[in-house]
């Protein structure tokens, strides 16, 4: 949630404020960690040290106000570089085996959370109770945090893509939708599952099976190099 990364051909620096400096020094290994004091003066000092004439800013993470401040206060030409953002996205797209293993671990925690909820969800539970129980259980079994605010919705509320859990109680014959994920060592999982409490109607079965068929078709077709649009 904070920090400024500067990458020069010779060396990289991570400038971070006092709240996170201790953790950064323990976890950041690819660059020199610097305690933030007077940020723009510190950046200018590094620009001068490395003889940089231009600074490219990642437009994916830089706000307009930050960009204007850089342009006004840095002793170099500041470029809002869309190409830099593309390069960073490409680098992040391909994961190392270590990163993949951590994502898998995060997903396994979420899967165990879902399995736990199958016994917890019943008629009379509120959406908030379902959300809180799922959050608590994932944290209990190893999640360091939640990937995002857990969504737990029931009945007609399940049509809301990013609805907020309410005090609505689950009724028999309703769908319950859960969108959730766990974080493990900085890596996130994300999954959505829908269950029915009681006996589903024929229409509910049809809708569920239609979505399931589409999912299985996509899983069978997906391959390396395929675009999301083609899939």
Where is each model-derived feature located?
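Active-site neighborhoods and metal-handling regions in enzymes and metal-associated proteins
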Residues: 1-231
């Amino acid at each position: 949630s904070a920090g400024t990364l500067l990458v020069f051909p010779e060396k990289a620096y991570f400038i971070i404020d006092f709240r996170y400096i201790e953790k950064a020094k323990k976890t950041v290994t690819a660059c020199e960690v610097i305690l933030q004091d007077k940020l723009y003066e510190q950046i200018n000092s590094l620009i001068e040290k490395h003889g940089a004439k231009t600074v490219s800013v990642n437009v994916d993470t830089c706000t307009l106000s930050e960009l204007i401040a850089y342009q006004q206060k840095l002793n170099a030409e500041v470029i809002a570089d869309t190409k830099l953002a593309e390069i960073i996205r490409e680098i992040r797209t391909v994961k190392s085996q270590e990163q993949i293993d951590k994502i898998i671990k995060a997903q396994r925690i979420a899967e165990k959370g879902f399995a736990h909820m199958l016994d917890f969800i019943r008629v009379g539970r509120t959406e908030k109770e379902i959300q809180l129980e799922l959050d608590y259980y994932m944290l209990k079994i190893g999640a360091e945090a939640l990937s995002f605010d857990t969504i737990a919705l029931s009945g007609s509320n399940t049509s809301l893509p990013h609805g907020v859990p309410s005090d609505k109680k689950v009724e028999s014959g309703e769908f319950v939708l859960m969108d959730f994920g766990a974080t493990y060592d900085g890596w996130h999982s994300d999954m959505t599952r829908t269950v029915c409490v009681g006996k589903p109607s024929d229409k509910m079965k049809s809708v569920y099976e239609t979505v399931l068929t589409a999912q299985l078709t996509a899983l069978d077709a997906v391959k390396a190099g395929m675009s999301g649009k083609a899939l």
